[in-house]
């Protein structure tokens, strides 16, 4: 397996020669983790196209893959696999998504059990547009002064599924749930709204990130609404800065794996007359409290 940093990119590396199934050996498994921690985004190329089952098994090597909870838009036999597309067949929408810009986010931040790693595979791509952008949110935290870091560690943030998507989620999962909130068992798929600390910590590397997004972050609950909006806008202005962002131009067969805790991602718009069809799985942390053991900055 060969890992090559992407020339001129702020983050990201291309991986050739990987065994993209669940039965990879321990050496490759550890090499992929190390590469992800170093580069945050990995682009797998030159591999045999995995079946749906192999794609799911590959993702499961890197954490628990929850079901999407969607009533439509997921693979009919494997609800864990999200179909992302603008495809319409016989008047019926296939998957979720459209050709418009999709704002900065990290998957499942509105659930108490947040995402750890994302996996997105390109099945069909448009001739232009549809790139996925990734911004390093560890870099944002590391740019803060010690005083700013200490203040940020005291804040909690409400995340919620974006308006208009609630009806696609199973009704029993539509609620606000927070870790330690009620003592009841929390299912991996539970929740469409939750509260998390503003600062997250990668349990493997110890790096800390500012855990917010434009798409799913509603407000900092410890601040007045106007103060919350002002600070969130200031922090989110980091997203998309070229010195901290990688724009991935898709090729059919690409599998991109990324650190969901330390990055946010967005999708560029494309011509709706063209097709963009992807399949995605997301792993969550085995211990849902792992991302929230951040130590207060000195």
UniProtKB/Swiss-Prot annotation:
**GO BP terms:** antibiotic biosynthetic process; pentalenolactone biosynthetic process
Residues binding Fe cation = 105, 107, 265
User: Which GO terms fall under molecular function for this chain's record?
Assistant: dioxygenase activity; L-ascorbic acid binding; metal ion binding
- The reply on keyword Oxidoreductase is yes
Q: Where does 2-oxoglutarate bind?
A: 132, 250, 276
Q: Which UniProt keywords apply?
A: Antibiotic biosynthesis, Dioxygenase, Iron, Metal-binding, Oxidoreductase, Vitamin C
The cofactor(s) it depends on are: Fe(2+)
Recorded protein name is Pentalenolactone F synthase
Activity regulation: the record says: Activated by ascorbate.
Q: Per the record, what are the reactions this protein catalyses?
A: pentalenolactone D + 2 2-oxoglutarate + 2 O2 = pentalenolactone F + 2 succinate + 2 CO2 + H2O
The protein's organism comes out as: Streptomyces exfoliatus (Streptomyces hydrogenans)
- Cofactor note from UniProt? Binds 1 Fe(2+) ion per subunit.
Pathway the protein contributes to = Antibiotic biosynthesis; pentalenolactone biosynthesis
Query: EC number(s) per UniProt?
Result: 1.14.11.36
Effect of gene knockout? Accumulation of pentalenolactone D and lack of production of pentalenolactone as well as the precursors pentalenolactones E and F.
Q: Could you tell me which Gene3D superfamilies the record lists for this protein?
A: Clavaminate synthase-like (3.60.130.10)
Q: Name the top EC class.
A: oxidoreductase
Q: Which family does it belong to?
A: Belongs to the TfdA dioxygenase family.
């Amino acid at each position: 397996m060969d890992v090559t940093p992407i020339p001129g990119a702020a983050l990201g590396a291309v991986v050739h020669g990987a065994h993209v199934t669940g039965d990879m050996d321990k050496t490759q498994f550890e090499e992929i983790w190390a590469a992800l921690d170093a580069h945050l985004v990995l682009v797998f190329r030159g591999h045999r196209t995995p079946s749906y089952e192999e794609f799911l098994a590959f993702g499961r090597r890197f954490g628990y893959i929850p079901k999407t909870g969607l009533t439509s838009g997921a693979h009919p036999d494997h609800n864990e696999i999200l179909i992302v597309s603008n495809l319409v067949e016989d008047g019926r929408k296939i998957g979720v998504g459209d050709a418009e810009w999709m704002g900065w986010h990290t998957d499942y931040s509105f659930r108490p059990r947040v995402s750890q790693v994302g996996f997105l595979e390109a099945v069909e791509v448009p001739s232009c547009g549809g790139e996925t952008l990734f911004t390093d949110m560890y870099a944002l935290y590391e740019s803060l002064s010690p005083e700013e870091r200490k203040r940020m560690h005291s804040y909690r943030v409400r995340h919620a599924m974006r308006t208009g998507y609630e009806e696609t989620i199973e009704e029993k999962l539509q609620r606000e749930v927070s870790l330690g909130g009620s003592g009841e068992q929390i299912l991996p798929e539970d929740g469409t709204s939750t509260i998390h600390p503003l600062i997250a910590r990668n349990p493997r590397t110890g790096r800390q990130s500012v855990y917010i997004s434009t798409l799913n972050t509603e407000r900092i609950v410890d601040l007045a609404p106007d103060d919350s909006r002002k600070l969130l806008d200031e922090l989110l202005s980091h997203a998309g800065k070229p010195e901290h962002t990688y724009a991935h131009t898709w090729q059919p067969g690409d599998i991109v794996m990324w650190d969901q805790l330390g990055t946010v991602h967005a999708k560029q718009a494309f011509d709706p007359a063209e097709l963009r069809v992807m399949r995605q799985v997301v792993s969550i942390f085995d211990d849902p409290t792992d991302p929230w053991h951040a130590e207060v900055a000195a």
